UniProtKB/Swiss-Prot annotation:
InterPro entries: AA_transpt_TM
Topology with respect to the bilayer: Multi-pass membrane protein
Source organism (scientific name): Medicago truncatula
One GO molecular-function entry: symporter activity
Protein's name according to its UniProt entry: Auxin transporter-like protein 1
GO CC terms: plasma membrane
Described purpose of this protein according to its UniProt entry: Carrier protein involved in proton-driven auxin influx. Mediates the formation of auxin gradient from developing leaves (site of auxin biosynthesis) to tips by contributing to the loading of auxin in vascular tissues and facilitating acropetal (base to tip) auxin transport within inner tissues of the root apex, and basipetal (tip to base) auxin transport within outer tissues of the root apex. May be involved in lateral roots and nodules formation.
């Protein structure tokens, strides 16, 4: 038993030494004259940076669609699903962090260097479980992040329309596609320090604006809260919440940007607790005020009264969507760089040029499927369910299936989980629940709703869910 413990300590020492060396290098970089302020804004590898990145990335445009989900689910189910999926998301993010540390400790033991190389989830799967798992991880992760980026573009166009309706949403998508393409200049998550901080501040403002504005507005006349009304709506709403707390597809990249990745384990959980303070009050207040009207208004901004406070919320969410686009797209940039052999290039401008082809299909898909709201649920059911719930839980069970793997695990079981049996029971529950409820029922409901949107509005819809113009005015009709 003593030799096993010594072996484990040896295994982890290499990882610790490498990480400490990286931290020293970062400190040396910051020591040069005149670079202190730049490093303060640009270089972020602390626990706090990771927390801001997780919280900022987790709740973006989906904040605006959660009241819509509540109208489909009803108040009680909406609250329960938020808490349930928030905790489940934190659990699977924890599993991903454990697998990352396991993979990295094994590779460091083999003297593998990760200088100028960002470890990604599919590489962790390949290192621990083989090439088939790499293919599965790569396919699901890239497709999810691709559509995650598409959703941010759609949200930009949907939001700006509520300030300036002189251009249709499709035209705004063209404009914001060009703006979001500038994220190619941000090298990695290590350089998102100031953006993550600002992004979370913007989301916090918008969430509390929605809450206060809905309460001040009060309930609309003859308000009706009929949810849950239809099974299709119920599972569509539940799957949008599954999508909300499935933002940990970039966990590995965020961990790799940290100076001490082992400290990540509980960060996502604490980020989720903060996110609850934004998502629950805003969704509850807006649904309380507008009720079933939300069934035809997937973007909460469309029902809130137009004033300077709302316009500020729209603008801040636009900036935050630009940041979240970068979060979703950066792992895709890394994959593309590795494919074309540019990943270890030090020049920011050369890498930016190489990354541009990634933005083109995202731009195109945002113009084809402009269905803000329904597309979230479809992506949640078909992609998020496997990418960040089923695959991590299954991978964890398979990685530690042998007694020797469990004994030599780089990370011990958490104190709240006294045995491996309980660990396996929780993981099996996650896999079964998400496969049946998230992918099965959620997939059926989301695709039914998505196809209905295509039939109603058509592909390449010029202005999805835009109210008709008043004949005598250029302003949109107030609801």
């Amino acid at each position: 038993m003593l030799s096993e413990k010594q072996g484990e300590e040896t295994m982890m020492s290499s990882l610790n030494e490498t990480i400490e060396l990286n931290e020293e290098r970062e400190e040396e970089k910051g020591a040069s004259p005149g670079s202190g302020f730049k490093n303060f804004l640009w270089h972020g590898g602390s626990v706090y940076d990771a927390w801001f990145s997780c919280a900022s990335n987790q709740v973006a445009q989906v904040l605006l669609t959660l009241p819509y989900s509540f109208s489909q689910l009803g108040m009680i189910s909406g609250i329960i699903f938020q808490v349930f999926y928030g905790l489940m998301g934190s659990w699977t993010a924890y599993l991903i962090s454990i697998l990352y540390v396991e993979y990295r400790s094994r590779k460091e033991k083999e003297n593998v260097s990760f200088k100028n190389h960002v470890i990604q989830w599919f590489e962790v799967l390949e290192g621990l479980l083989g090439p088939y798992w790499k293919a599965i991880g790569l396919a699901f992760n890239c497709t999810f992040l691709l559509f995650g980026s598409v959703i941010q573009l759609i949200a930009c166009a949907s939001n700006i329309y509520y300030i300036n309706d002189h251009l249709d949403k499709r035209t705004w998508t063209y404009i914001f596609g060009a703006c979001c393409a500038t994220t190619v200049f941000i090298p990695s998550f290590h350089n998102y320090r100031i953006w993550s901080f600002l992004g979370l501040g913007m989301t916090t403002y918008t969430a509390w604006y929605m809450t206060i504005a809905a309460i001040v507005h009060g309930q609309v006349e003859n308000v009706v809260h009929s949810g849950p009304k239809k099974m299709v709506w119920y599972f569509t709403g539940a799957t949008n919440i599954l999508y909300t707390f499935g933002g940990h597809a970039v966990t590995v990249e965020i961990m790799h940007a940290m100076w001490k990745p082992q400290k990540f384990k509980a960060i996502y959980f604490f980020a989720t607790l903060y996110v609850f303070t934004l998502t629950l009050p805003s969704a509850i207040a807006v649904y309380w005020a507008f009720g079933d009207q939300l069934l035809d208004h997937s973007n909460a901004f469309s029902l809130l009264p137009r004033n300077a406070w709302r316009d500020a919320g729209v603008i801040l969410m636009l900036i935050h969507q630009f940041i979240t686009f970068g979060f979703a797209c950066t792992p895709l940039y890394f994959v593309w760089e590795k494919v074309i052999g540019m990943h270890d290039t030090k020049s920011i401008f050369l890498r930016a040029l190489a990354r541009l082809p990634v933005v083109i299909p995202i731009w195109f898909l945002a113009i084809i499927f402009p269905f803000f709201g329904p597309i979230n649920s479809a992506v949640g059911a078909l992609l998020v369910s496997f990418t960040v719930y089923v695959i991590p839980a299954s991978a964890h069970m398979l990685t530690y299936r042998s007694a020797s793997a469990r004994q030599n695990a780089a990370e011990k079981l958490p104190k709240v989980i006294p045995s491996w049996t309980l660990m396996y029971v929780i993981n099996a529950f996650v896999v079964i629940w998400v496969t049946i409820v998230g992918f099965g029922f959620g997939g059926w409901a989301s695709m039914t709703n998505f196809i209905k949107q295509v039939d109603t509005f058509g592909l390449f819809a010029k202005c999805y869910q835009c109210p008709p113009k008043l004949p005598a005015s250029n302003h949109t009709m107030h609801h």
